[in-house]
Amino acid sequence: MAELLQAEAELWCHAFGYLKSMALQCAIKLGIPNAIHHCGGTASLPELHAALPVAASKRPCVSRIMTFLAVSGIFRQEIPVDGEAVVGVRYSLTPASRLLVDDDNSVSSSQHTCLSQFMLLCCSPLHFRASQSLADWLRDDEGDAAAAETPFMMANGASLYGLACRDTEFGARFSEGMSSDSRFVAEILARSSCAPVFAGLTSLVDVGGGDGTTARAIARAYPHMRCSVLELPQVVDAELADVGAVEFIAGDMMEYIPPADAVLLKV
């Protein structure tokens, strides 16, 4: 009996796993990480109520969302040991939520790149629609191959890059999200602790490297290395092509990857 109950609990965890993504999206959209940061790194419920754009009638729900996010590891929940009421609970940032602070005047902004826009991109309904189409896509054997090449294309009518090119608003969000992640990765790769990874390399091609943020950071950290970026033609424009330290190559990685000592493929 205990084994069956445990099995059911595991199924519940899988079935409602999407709530973690939705709670994270909610926290970013409401600006909870910034609100806690502006309160000095720790905030009470009344302070969050005052700082967040939440309707007064919905404020009782904030504590539930914060508890869920604390259990998920996004925030840290500090409950007073003297048994005070819920209003005495305080919330603070964790290493994960510090990456979601986008205040330009914050100390953290000089230490890392904010990943809020990238996380919102990952939590986009576009991806959830695609995941819900997975079974239909696997069963489909009669559809147009071009239209149903991936579950994402079946659900949204175009590839992710196709949507970014067709919808200027989404394209801007996509570019900002990918750029923020590239800036974060670039900061890590440029540190001396990563030097052994690049030892002996004289050339590197960043496949799908976007605006070249990562490649430029590597080129600055390792000036002896010839760095290039392979991107789709619609991404590579005259402005990107003239950045000096990095060469931009227009092409499709599914068809051709320029020769180099190393290939960087960020996922």
Can you say where each PLM-predicted feature lies in the sequence?
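Conserved Class I S-adenosyl-L-methionine-dependent methyltransferase catalytic core
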Residues: 2, 7-203
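Short, low-complexity, polar/charged sequence segments that are solvent-exposed and flexible
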Residues: 43, 247-250, 267
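A short, aliphatic-rich alpha-helical micro-motif
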Residues: 198, 257-260
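Class I SAM-dependent methyltransferase SAM/SAH-binding core
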Residues: 201-256
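A conserved beta-strand element that flanks and buttresses the S-adenosyl-L-methionine
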Residues: 263-265
